[in-house]
Amino acid sequence: MAAAARVSEVKAEGLLRGACAALAAAAALLVGLSTQTETVLLVRKKATVKDVQALWVLAMAAAAAAGYHLLQLLKCLYLGRVGGARPCRRSSRALAWTCLLLDKACAYTTFATTVAAAQACVVALDGAHAVQWTKLCNIYTRFCEQVAGSLVLGMLAAVGTAVLSAASARNVFRHYSSLETYAAH
């Protein structure tokens, strides 16, 4: 019964990892491939992701998160197929700790880069009157809409990664004996 429950947990983790990988990849592609060219005062200007450093960092971090989730998805698929073969307790404990730390790092990085990009986009949306920056989203509407979509996808990927991090923490603590075992000795 415990083995069947573990296999279903691995499948659920695999589904969530696949969803997070898809969301992060979509966010990276949407922001990374967004461009728009407009004529402003007889000058053609092209808006790209490299114009705002925070958007470029978001594209790279989301792509890295998608790659990480794909690697972890392969691990889930492997464990789902070889569910009966248990590695030694010490190596599985080390693997659980490694996955927890990597999941936490991925969650924090995805969340931080998405929020930083959102903060940079607020300036593009509202402008900064103190330094006479105009509202860029009035000019590059489609570009701003695509960036907003990638911010939503990035935040959903960050939330999914946080849920995976909680599942990884549960997996780590599963490797340690309960307090009742220590009380009996």
Curated annotation (Swiss-Prot):
Keyword check for Transmembrane helix: yes
Keywords recorded for this protein, A-Z: Cell membrane, Membrane, Transmembrane, Transmembrane helix
Source species, domain of life: Eukaryota
Protein name: CASP-like protein 2C3
Compartments reported by the entry: Cell membrane
Ranges of the Cytoplasmic topological domain: 1-13, 75-104, 168-185
Topological type in the membrane: Multi-pass membrane protein
Pfam families reported for this sequence: CASP_dom
InterPro entries (UniProt xref): CASP/CASPL, CASP_dom
Family stated for the protein in its record: Belongs to the Casparian strip membrane proteins (CASP) family.
Main location (coarse class): membrane
Extracellular topological domain: 35-53, 126-146
Assembly, per entry: Homodimer and heterodimers.
TM annotation in the entry: 14-34, 54-74, 105-125, 147-167
GO cellular component, one term: plasma membrane
Organism (species): Zea mays (Maize)
